Swiss-Prot record:
<dbReference type="InterPro" id="IPR000952">
    <property type="entry name" value="AB_hydrolase_4_CS"/>
</dbReference>
<keyword id="KW-0442">Lipid degradation</keyword>
<keyword id="KW-0968">Cytoplasmic vesicle</keyword>
<dbReference type="GO" id="GO:0001669">
    <property type="term" value="C:acrosomal vesicle"/>
</dbReference>
<dbReference type="GO" id="GO:0014912">
    <property type="term" value="P:negative regulation of smooth muscle cell migration"/>
</dbReference>
<feature type="topological domain" description="Cytoplasmic">
    <location>
        <begin position="1"/>
        <end position="9"/>
    </location>
</feature>
<keyword id="KW-0735">Signal-anchor</keyword>
<dbReference type="GO" id="GO:0047372">
    <property type="term" value="F:monoacylglycerol lipase activity"/>
</dbReference>
<dbReference type="GO" id="GO:0002080">
    <property type="term" value="C:acrosomal membrane"/>
</dbReference>
<keyword id="KW-0443">Lipid metabolism</keyword>
<dbReference type="InterPro" id="IPR012020">
    <property type="entry name" value="ABHD4"/>
</dbReference>
<keyword id="KW-0719">Serine esterase</keyword>
<comment type="similarity">
    <text>Belongs to the AB hydrolase superfamily. AB hydrolase 4 family.</text>
</comment>
<dbReference type="GO" id="GO:0046464">
    <property type="term" value="P:acylglycerol catabolic process"/>
</dbReference>
<keyword id="KW-0325">Glycoprotein</keyword>
<protein>
    <recommendedName>
        <fullName>Monoacylglycerol lipase ABHD2</fullName>
        <ecNumber>3.1.1.23</ecNumber>
        <ecNumber>3.1.1.6</ecNumber>
        <ecNumber>3.1.1.79</ecNumber>
    </recommendedName>
</protein>
<feature type="transmembrane region" description="Helical; Signal-anchor for type II membrane protein">
    <location>
        <begin position="10"/>
        <end position="30"/>
    </location>
</feature>
């Protein structure tokens, strides 16, 4: 009798379990998708100056909310994964010409050149010289999307193809791209300066490319000639400082490290005959390379130590990271410099962001832009689920470049007026 009376209570128990399970799933979804995070304008770090005030007035994206797609856009991991897997949605196919440059060591550097599709807003000849992220090139979707947008805003674009990154271009010397080598980027810039003597340059670097362009500008004052400004997006500033954080499981960085290392292994091994073949006249530093250690490598640091540092004869990984990081060159850049990172970038630990923050507090030419969301090179925009083809990052870089061009035009006009007044006196 008692058993019969108790049976109706069982469904209520099961309903409670179901409710708890649903609540747990919803909690995990809210936490993973970071749905409670607010949308806000990016945090800005800069010195109060005429330039910074002009930029705040001329670049609405610096003071407006960045609004990512509602459902998944506040997750740095999803933004990063979509960038890594898709690049961009409905990416255009800009038409360009591939250029080849023979380097002094026999390497063949390539870059793609895209002509502007409209007149620039200030009417001048401006060329964007662009350095992509690790193992990337002009055919990547995020590069194509950015180039197409820049062309439509009146910019000529030159995009470096990292040495060894294009699958259909063979290496012609026992060397490929490294973390901080500026040789190929410098050769591309010099080609543009020779071919278009009237042009002015806007320098743009994405991720690893941000390290390369900042290091290039800081290496010598001559590299900043004809440069209007520089933009670096999602770089880590110091490989030496990043080394330890990249081995941590916090924010899944160790997993991302493994994925990038696996991709690097595939690229290196696809060129193993050109790099390590018996017939190749390779530098002494590469003679002792143990390919078995490359096969078993699970991190970028292991690959850098076993292979990459040896392309330039560094004696240790520490020396390689110290010399090839842009951190020691940033204070030598005198042109306007915008550094952009996302607070939820799972690849760049927050401790690394003290570098651009500190620099922006000391230098009037530097502005550090830190939105809450965007992941690593994601910065997708959209209403609910589906992202737009053009990202916040694409629009910000062009908007900043336009503002700097106008700033320089205004300065030039003021100088001309002052000169005329002086002559009249």
């Amino acid at each position: 009798m008692n058993a019969m009376l108790e049976t109706p209570e069982l469904p209520a128990v099961f309903d409670g379990v179901k409710l708890a399970a649903v609540a747990a799933v919803l909690y995990v979804i809210v936490r993973c998708l970071n749905l409670k995070s607010p949308t806000a304008p990016p945090d800005l770090y800069f010195q109060d100056s005429g330039l910074s005030r002009f930029l705040l007035k001329s670049c609405p994206l610096l003071t407006k909310e960045y609004i990512p797609p509602l459902i998944w856009g506040k997750s740095g991991h999803i933004q990063t994964a979509l960038y890594g897997k898709m690049g961009r949605v409905r990416s255009p196919h800009p038409y360009g010409h591939r250029k080849f440059i023979t380097m002094s060591d026999g390497a063949t550097s390539t870059f793609d050149l895209f002509e502007p599709l409209a007149e620039h807003c200030v009417g001048d000849d401006i060329t964007m010289v662009i350095c992509p992220g690790i193992a990337n090139h002009s055919e990547k979707q995020y590069i194509r999307t950015f180039v197409d947008y820049a062309q439509k805003n009146g910019y000529r674009c030159a995009v470096l193809n990292h040495l060894g990154a294009l699958p259909n271009i063979e290496l012609t010397s026992p060397r490929m791209f490294t973390y901080g080598c500026t040789w190929e980027f410098g050769a591309m810039v010099n080609y543009i300066k020779r071919t278009y003597p009237q042009t002015q340059l806007v320098v743009v670097g994405f991720s690893l490319g941000g390290n390369i362009v900042c290091k290039y500008l800081g290496e010598t004052q001559a590299n900043q000639e004809k440069v209007l400004c520089c933009v670096s997006v999602c770089q880590g500033y110091s490989a030496l400082r990043a080394q330890e954080t990249f081995m941590q499981w916090d924010q899944c960085r160790r997993f991302y490290n493994f994925l990038m290392a696996d991709n690097m292994k595939k690229i290196i091994l696809s060129h193993r005959q050109a790099l390590f073949g018996d017939h190749v006249k390779k530098p002494q530093s590469l003679e002792d390379t143990d390919l078995s250690r490359l096969y078993t490598a699970t991190s970028l640091m292991q690959i850098d130590d076993n292979v990459m540092r040896k392309f330039h004869g560094y004696n240790s990984l520490k020396e390689y990271y110290e010399e090839e990081s842009c951190m020691r060159y940033l204070h030598r850049i005198y042109v306007p410099l915008m550094l952009v990172n996302a607070a939820d970038d799972p690849l760049v630990h927050e401790s690394l962001l003290t570098i651009p923050k500190s620099l922006s507090e000391k230098r009037e030419n530097v502005m550090f832009v830190l939105p809450l969301h965007g992941g690593h090179l994601g910065f997708f925009e959209g209403s609910v689920l589906f992202p737009e083809p053009l990202t916040w990052m694409d629009k910000l870089v062009v908007e900043y470049a336009n503002a700097i061009c106008q700033w320089e035009r205004n300065k030039s006009q003021c100088s001309d007026t002052e000169q005329m007044e002086a002559e009249l006196e």
